[in-house]
């Protein structure tokens, strides 16, 4: 629908060395506002709310400005705030720059909090083992979905040179991804109230004929009807 930046004027440059970018998009009939960020790096781990040059304070100010923007402008919207936020969401107060967000658990949730609190092998920044890349979602998403899947994507494990090759040629951060499950999967492809071989035959026909019909045939909700939907359907029939 639209792509634009917010907090672009000079008065916000201290908090946002890179202005947040908003993507307004529709997917599977739902509207989402995705706010991409790259917060100020570094610091000494101590949040000094008096010193405006303090790196932790700059990140603290940035996340609270984003919260204010969402609360005022997008109070009923499906909002995802993500990016390299350059700080630890699992840090103890009073030095957790995200504490105001964490305290407002009715309206906000870090989808990757379990990763941040878990084993360091799943963290997004291996060079100085820490989890700095986050996905924050609003209550419209976590209350309105049927499930969430979040994981750090270890592309380096698929490269011959491993982490060294990835770090040198791609990034020093691993991406963090989220899958939002908005609907309970339906295996009744033909809509006759029964799940059986006739549903497999119809789905095979759709796949072979490259039919782009979505509807109930898109079992995994990836906006395509393909072999992966067929695998899910056959697995369901074998197990039920």
Predicted segments with their positions:
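A long, amphipathic alpha-helix that forms part
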Residues: 53-76
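Structured beta-strand-rich core segments of catalytic domains in phosphoester-bond hydrolases
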Residues: 1-40
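Extracytoplasmic/secreted envelope proteins and their assembly/folding machinery
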Residues: 20, 60-63, 67, 95-98, ...
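Acidic/histidine-rich helix-loop elements
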Residues: 42-58
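Soluble non-cytosolic domains of exported or imported proteins
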Residues: 13-17, 53-61, 92, 126-130, ...
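Residue-level detector of buried hydrophobic side-chain packing
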Residues: 23, 38, 66, 84, ...
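Alpha-helical segments with a strong preference for the paired helices of cellulosomal dockerin domains
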Residues: 71, 93, 189-213, 222-240
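Metal-dependent phosphoester-hydrolase catalytic domains
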Residues: 4-17, 71-80, 85-184
């Amino acid at each position: 629908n639209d792509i634009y930046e917010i907090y672009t004027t000079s008065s916000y440059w201290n908090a946002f060395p890179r202005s947040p970018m908003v993507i307004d998009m529709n997917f599977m009939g739902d509207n989402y506002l995705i706010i991409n960020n790259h917060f100020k790096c570094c610091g000494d781990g101590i949040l000094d709310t008096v010193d405006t040059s303090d790196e932790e304070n700059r990140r603290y100010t940035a996340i609270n400005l984003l919260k204010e923007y969402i609360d005022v402008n997008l109070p009923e919207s499906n909002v995802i705030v993500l990016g390299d936020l350059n700080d630890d969401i699992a840090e103890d107060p009073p030095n957790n720059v995200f504490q105001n967000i964490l305290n407002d658990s009715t309206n906000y949730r870090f989808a990757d909090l379990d990763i941040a609190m878990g084993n360091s092998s799943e963290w997004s920044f291996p060079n100085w083992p820490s989890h700095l890349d986050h996905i924050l979602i609003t209550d419209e998403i976590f209350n309105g979905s049927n499930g969430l899947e979040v994981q750090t994507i270890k592309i380096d494990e698929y490269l011959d040179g491993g982490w060294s090759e990835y770090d040198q040629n791609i990034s020093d951060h691993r991406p963090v991804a989220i899958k939002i499950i908005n609907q309970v999967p339906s295996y009744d492809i033909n809509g006759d109230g029964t799940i059986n071989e006739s549903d497999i035959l119809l789905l095979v026909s759709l796949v072979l004929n490259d039919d782009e019909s979505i509807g109930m045939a898109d079992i995994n909700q990836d906006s395509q009807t393909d072999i992966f939907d067929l695998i899910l359907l056959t697995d369901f029939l074998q197990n039920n």
